[in-house]
Amino acid sequence: MARGKRSTQRDADLELESLQSEIESESPQPVTKSKAKKNKKKLNKASAFNSDNDSNYDLKPEDDEVDEEVVPVKKKPSKKSKKAKANAFEAFADEQSVEEEEEEDSEKPVRKNKKSSKKASPKNAFDALADDMDDLSLDEEESESSEKSKKKKKKSKSKDDGSEALDDGDIESSEKDKKKKKKSKENDDAPKKDRKTRKKEEKARKLASMLESENKDNDANAAPLNKTDAFKDGLPSGRLIFAYASGQKVAPDGSNPADGITVTGNLLSPPNSRDLQVEKLSVSAWGKLLIKDSELNLINGRRYGLIAPNGSGKSTLLHAIACGLIPTPSSLDFYLLDREYIPNELTCVEAVLDINEQERKHLEAMMEDLLDDPDKNAVELDTIQTRLTDLETENSDHRVYKILRGLQFTDEMIAKRTNELSGGWRMRIALARILFIKPTLMMLDEPTNHLDLEAVAWLEEYLTHEMEGHTLLITCHTQDTLNEVCTDIIHLYHQKLDYYSGNYDTFLKVRAERDVQLAKKARQQEKDMAKLQNKLNMTGSEQQKKAKAKVKAMNKKLEKDKQSGKVLDEEIIQEKQLVIRFEDCGGGIPSPAIKFQDVSFNYPGGPTIFSKLNFGLDLKSRVALVGPNGAGKTTLIKLILEKVQPSTGSVVRHHGLRLALFNQHMGDQLDMRLSAVEWLRTKFGNKPEGEMRRIVGRYGLTGKSQVIPMGQLSDGQRRRVLFAFLGMTQPHILLLDEPTNALDIDTIDALADALNNFDGGVVFITHDFRLIDQVAEEIWIVQNGTVKEFDGEIRDYKMMLKQQIAKEREEERRIELEKQKK
């Protein structure tokens, strides 16, 4: 029984792949083949998806010359009834209506051009569907005459034998035939191609539904087939499972990123293109329109930075591509980094190499299917062969070690299993996987989260020098990374995708100039309206009528400009502005507030982390801690907070000193069932609700976001709640461990202003070079058991890191060249 089900499953999978290929070509694949050339059709139309206009689906590739082949049918078609060509799908529908009556008849092969062969009868529903699809490719004239002949024979037989009247199914079929013929006459001018496409898509859906039923029978624990997962541009797709670098499409909470996303638009890129171009793109998530009638243009070889405030739809757009909701050319391979690698028994190296093996198996399966018609699929076969060659590198292990070490993995960590790593390190594993496989379109959603400065510097160098011939689409809250990496900026603003050449600084300059021009234009419109209003008050009735019409037209145009983002520069600044302010600490603490005296530390049974540290902190301190991963930056914060005690030496603190810590795990303290105001009142119950709402508003939480459960807030909004909590404790010294994760650029700038205006001390760890540049007055390097002040600015430190990376890269190239010479 189980073997039979697996056989059925394999048949279904093969049929799905075959059907997908047939629909992608937008023309039925011929089963009856002739050496005569078919009429060639130009590939000059856009392919639409989720569109009401079916004519936009048309992709008309050229038909190739093919050999002749024998096709089994259920009855030999009549040659006497040949007429003008009719729609092949009408014949197919008619054939289905009499299918039950023909089951007892034996199938006979029809000789086509004096050649014959036999085909086995279908054994299950999937085979039956396959035979139905084969019958569609018969010559349309023969299909029509065959079906008419069958109907006549059936009717004649029914009358002669005195058989019973037609059952309800036959009556319904007869009525449907009449309606179809009538509709065919009314739509003679309509393109037949569209009807065929729609019929094929309907068959694909039915087949996918049957496949889902089989999957449920075979494996009760298997995840149900989701239409979003199974279809790409309405087509069955086997590639989508490999589109996520994490190795999983389902989020940690069990949700599918594609759930709730709807997309419309037209694909412009031809099948063999390495670009992704879509016009009239609209994207919605859970009913909220995020992108409206925009163009998506991703040109091969360019590196795009996608920027927008949190909640605007950046991640939704990336998921829409990765989930197949936005169609892509068949030759374009893509991966998305959006979450950490799923923990398992694989080591770090094995986990990275695994993505290579999965991709290779997938490509080989695709190639096997395409080899059924190598002439027709020559372009796709060439693309797959090139991709397979790229995957078959002799130094794969060396590349994996290079990437992992660049992401600051130690040799000890590399040897660990992935289920022994924290979520932050598994995020680096997922990043290493996508960098190793290096798809044609690489999508990175906040890749610098969970990285330290050294890893960020290495990643910037890698993306800048190793992406030739590949396209990058990245969302990132680090302005420095956007400046170092990006050749173009895509600004998602007012539901539109606006494109700017250059990096982030260039975007800011061009955007500011454009805003000024828009402001001038808007002011001029207002002046013109004021003049018209004055004339309106001073003229006669006829002139007043004309002036009123002109004022009305200008008002309408001004309103349209405002809706499209063309507003005054004061309004633009107000929209972008966000203010965060920490409560004053009150002072009263003499310097030094904290003093380290010959402090050494090691965990029980572990190596020495610090040896004889001597330094002090006060309310004027603005210190950024930098250094390689594992050097002890977080441990130093714990020593300051007295969460761990020195092995030797002492840490002296003022008795009235108040400290506050922000770290990656503070979000666990939040009660997601409560609103921000409710949760803060549980911590500071003496403050009335009105005052609490005013305080929360300082941190960018206004209106509805103050009173809805925090489970409905974004990660960035929840971080603002934590900032509000820290500020209300009125600490003398703020300790921040990676505060910028999940914040957008505007919020990071607001945080920098808040720290600069804070009257207490600040000690922080961050991977954001720009935040350090904005806030830090001292840079301390934590390395080799010591803490030393860096003599220079953060730009100098970053330049030093990049020089080391460049030196290592040149050394590797030299070694490779020597190997090639040998």
From Swiss-Prot:
- Phosphotyrosine modification sites are 57
Q: Which family does it belong to?
A: Belongs to the ABC transporter superfamily.
What is this protein's name? Uncharacterized ABC transporter ATP-binding protein C825.01
Q: Where in the cell is it found?
A: Cytoplasm
**Gene Ontology biological process:** cytoplasmic translational initiation
Residues of the signal sequence? none
InterPro entries in the cross-refs = AAA+_ATPase (IPR003593), ABC_tran_Xtn (IPR032781), ABC_transporter-like_ATP-bd (IPR003439), ABC_transporter-like_CS (IPR017871), ABCF_EF3_subfamily (IPR050611), P-loop_NTPase (IPR027417)
Locations of Basic residues compositional bias?
A: 34-44, 73-85, 111-121
Residue ranges annotated as compositionally biased, kind Acidic residues, are 61-70, 92-106, 129-144, 163-172
Binding-site residues for ATP, renumbered to this chain: 308-315, 627-634
Query: Origin, by domain of life?
Result: Eukaryota
Question: GO cellular-component terms in the record?
Answer: cytosol
Where the record annotates domain ABC transporter, the positions are 276-519, 594-809
Keyword terms, alphabetized: ATP-binding, Cytoplasm, Nucleotide-binding, Phosphoprotein, Repeat
Give the organism, scientific name: Schizosaccharomyces pombe (strain 972 / ATCC 24843)
The family database entries (Pfam families) matched by this protein are listed as: ABC_tran (PF00005), ABC_tran_Xtn (PF12848)
This entry's Gene Ontology molecular function terms read: ATP binding; ATP hydrolysis activity
Q: Which Gene3D superfamilies match?
A: P-loop containing nucleotide triphosphate hydrolases
Instruction: List residues modified as Phosphoserine.
Output: 27, 47, 51, 55, 97, 137, 163
Positions of the UniProt region annotated as Disordered: 1-230
